[in-house]
Regions:
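Functional-site microenvironments in short loops/helix caps that host divalent-cation chemistry
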Residues: 1-161
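Conserved small/polar residues in nucleotide/adenosyl-binding loops
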Residues: 164-165
């Protein structure tokens, strides 16, 4: 997994990946496709749920351990106890089971950037039909206007920040 990248770097990777793919398509006589991009928060949430309705975690249940007592994702089980789940840092993507869409580590391991702008009021005033708030901050904007949504939690976050929905 990739860690330590800014939102700008993640977005730049999407642009680079689009250019590489379009070059390959052009060389093979294929048509261009949609650009690669960071997901909207609502898109990330649906992808993380794996098509399960209102599922708290990608694996479908409210628990962070399976029946054998093993953790179902790589996140900090409790305060200051990083080692308890066997993942003292990031782990290989295939270390845990995929969700219903076949996506791995949608909770824990590394957090994911979304293209949605972060604003504390968006959850109070947002609408179910279009809950994503997009704002392209300008260089001179206040830092508060430059915040972006991060979802999924990471290996160093407790399980409650790894929920698939808010």
């Amino acid at each position: 997994p990739v860690v330590g990248v800014t939102w700008t770097q993640a977005k730049a990777f999407s642009v680079w990946r689009t250019q590489i793919y379009h070059s390959w398509l052009e060389a093979n006589g294929d048509l261009f496709v949609n650009d690669f991009r960071l997901p909207l928060e609502s898109e990330w949430e649906r992808a993380a749920r794996g098509d399960l309705e209102q599922s708290q975690f990608p694996w479908g249940g409210p628990y962070i351990r399976n029946a054998s007592g093993c953790f179902l994702a790589n996140f900090k089980p409790m305060r200051g106890r990083y080692f308890e789940d066997g993942g003292f840092h990031t782990v290989k993507v295939y270390s845990y089971n995929p969700n219903g869409f076949g996506l791995y580590c949608m909770a824990g391991n590394v957090a994911e950037w979304c293209s949605t702008a972060f604003d504390e009021s968006q959850y109070e005033f947002g609408h179910d039909m279009n809950s994503d708030y997009e704002y392209e901050a300008k260089d001179g904007d206040h830092p508060v206007k430059k915040r972006k949504v991060i979802r999924g939690g990471s290996w160093k976050d407790i399980g409650s920040v790894s929920y698939t929905h808010l």
